[in-house]
Amino acid sequence: MEVAAKLSGARISAQKARLVADQIRGKKVGEALNLLAFSSKKAAEILKKVLESAVANAEHNEGADVDDLKVSTVFVNEGRSLKRIMPRAKGRADRIVKRSCHITVKVADK
């Protein structure tokens, strides 16, 4: 049994979120939550919420035991980019790209 939780449009770049996602892939849920709780990255807090949602989905919808769950799949895809302009000297302007991502976490029992 595999249960998923998704977050669309998280306001962090996919590249930064993947750094944290790679650390929890394949680990037991308790170990992954502990790792995310003590990480200082912004992506860790976002991924922790998505992982907790996936665990709650597994408990509520499938009646799964939390101790048996592990993080089977984590992937981060690029979301919509917001393009902004930063004024510079002498009438010039630079483009600022504010990136977002879509995060999917799947948990499964062994």
From Swiss-Prot:
Membership in a protein family: Belongs to the universal ribosomal protein uL22 family.
UniProt function note: This protein binds specifically to 23S rRNA; its binding is stimulated by other ribosomal proteins, e.g. L4, L17, and L20. It is important during the early stages of 50S assembly. It makes multiple contacts with different domains of the 23S rRNA in the assembled 50S subunit and ribosome.
NCBIfam families, sorted: rplV_bact
Native source organism of the sequence: Pseudomonas syringae pv. tomato (strain ATCC BAA-871 / DC3000)
Keywords for the protein's UniProt record, in alphabetical order: Ribonucleoprotein, Ribosomal protein, RNA-binding, rRNA-binding
Pfam family, one: Ribosomal_L22
Gene3D superfamilies, A to Z: Ribosomal protein L22/L17
GO molecular function annotations of the record: rRNA binding; structural constituent of ribosome
UniProt-listed PROSITE patterns: RIBOSOMAL_L22
Record PANTHER family: CHLOROPLAST 50S RIBOSOMAL PROTEIN L22-RELATED, LARGE RIBOSOMAL SUBUNIT PROTEIN UL22M
Protein name in the entry: Large ribosomal subunit protein uL22
Any Gene Ontology biological process: translation
GO cellular component term, pick one: cytosolic large ribosomal subunit
